[in-house]
A protein has these predicted regions:
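N-proximal helix/coil linker or "cap" segments that precede and/or mark the start of modular domains
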Residues: 1-16
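Short loop/turn microsegments at loop-to-beta-strand junctions
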Residues: 10, 36, 124-125
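A short beta-strand-turn-helix
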Residues: 14-34
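Short active-site neighborhood of thiol/selenol oxidoreductases, capturing the structured segment around
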Residues: 29-49
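Conserved small/polar residues in nucleotide/adenosyl-binding loops
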Residues: 45, 135-138
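Structural microenvironment flanking redox-active thiols in thiol-disulfide oxidoreductases
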Residues: 49-89
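Short, internal strand/loop/helix patches
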Residues: 89-120
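A short, hydrophobic beta-strand/beta-hairpin element that forms part of a small beta-sheet core
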Residues: 125-134
Length: 138
C-alpha cells in the first residue's frame, strides 16, 4: 500500500556514514522535525546525478532557511551513498540515507522493479514532506 497524506512514516532502520557507520530508526529520525525526504532509483545513475540530486542541492539553502531538513534515500548500500555524496559535493546538512535492503521503500509502497535493467528492486522517484512523523502537504 502506498503512503498517503496524513499517514505516519513507517518505522524501519536505515544506514548512513558520517564519522562511521550509523544505524538510524526512521521514527527517531523524523520525530519532532520538519523534513523533505526524497527518493531516487539509484546513486550514480544519469538522471539522479544530473538532475534530481542537483535540484535539491540548489534548493537546499531555502529549505534550511525555512527550518526544513532534507534527506535523500536510495536502495543502495551506505558506502555507495557516501561516495555519491562526495562526488556530487552534497552540502553539510543534506543527509544521504541508505535503504540497502529496500525495507523502507517497500513500507512506503514506493518500490519499483528495475530487474530488466539489472538493478533489482529500487525506489521510485518521490518527494515527501514530513512533519513530526506525518506525511503532510507543505
Amino acid at each position: 500500500m502506498t503512503i498517503h497524506v496524513g499517514d505516519r512514516i513507517p518505522e524501519v532502520t536505515l544506514k548512513r556514514i558520517r564519522e562511521g557507520m550509523e544505524t538510524i530508526d526512521t521514527h527517531a529520525l523524523f520525530d519532532s522535525r520538519k523534513a523533505v525526504l526524497f527518493g531516487v532509483p539509484g546513486a550514480f545513475t544519469p538522471t539522479c546525478s544530473a538532475r534530481h540530486l542537483p535540484g535539491f542541492i540548489e534548493q537546499f539553502p531555502e529549505f534550511r532557511h525555512r527550518g526544513i531538513e532534507v534527506f535523500c534515500m536510495a536502495v543502495n548500500d551506505p558506502f555507495v551513498m557516501k561516495a555519491w555524496g562526495e562526488s556530487q559535493q552534497v552540502p553539510d546538512g543534506l543527509q544521504l540515507l541508505s535503504d540497502g535492503n529496500g525495507e523502507f521503500t517497500r513500507a512506503l509502497g514506493l518500490e519499483m522493479d528495475a530487474s530488466s535493467s539489472g538493478m533489482g528492486i529500487r525506489s521510485r522517484r518521490f518527494a515527501l514532506y514530513v512533519d513530526c512523523l506525518l506525511y503532510t502537504s507543505p
